[in-house]
From Swiss-Prot:
Gene, per the UniProt record: rplT
Any Pfam family matching the protein: Ribosomal_L20
Coiled-coil segments: none
Source organism of the structure: Erwinia tasmaniensis (strain DSM 17950 / CFBP 7177 / CIP 109463 / NCPPB 4357 / Et1/99)
Family that this chain belongs to: Belongs to the bacterial ribosomal protein bL20 family.
Protein name per the record: Large ribosomal subunit protein bL20
Length: 118
């Protein structure tokens, strides 16, 4: 039985990892052993941060809605409660967009929320 030489497979595997590590600083983009660890860690960060991105955007939307609501004389929590009581179903992403780009519409929503709370 012929001897199997694995140089071709190893070379391909190394090339694949080094290609993924392209653009990394120093040895992380040149040395296979270091690059492999860097690529694994990058994958872990990417996996974690895909989940964190959703939380961070929601936090950003809430901060923007709160700021706009307070300029109209109501807190965020009372504003959201008022919208629920007025049976206005707009998600936070759209509310934040309205708060930033269409202040008149946002002010009208605040008034509806205030009347629903009263």
């Amino acid at each position: 039985m012929a001897r199997v030489k694995r140089g071709v497979v190893a070379r391909a595997r190394h090339k694949k990892i080094l290609k993924q590590a392209k653009g990394y600083y120093g040895a992380r983009s040149r040395v296979y052993r270091v690059a492999f660890q860097a690529v694994i860690k990058a994958g872990q960060y990417a996996y974690r941060d895909r989940r964190q991105r959703k939380r961070q955007f929601r936090q950003l939307w809430i901060a923007r809605i709160n700021a706009a609501a307070r300029t109209n004389g109501i807190s965020y929590s009372r504003f959201i409660n008022g919208l629920k009581k007025a049976s206005i179903e707009i998600d936070r992403k759209i509310l934040a967009d309205i708060a930033v780009f269409d202040k008149a519409v946002f002010a009208a929503l605040v008034e509806k929320a205030k009347t629903a709370l009263a």
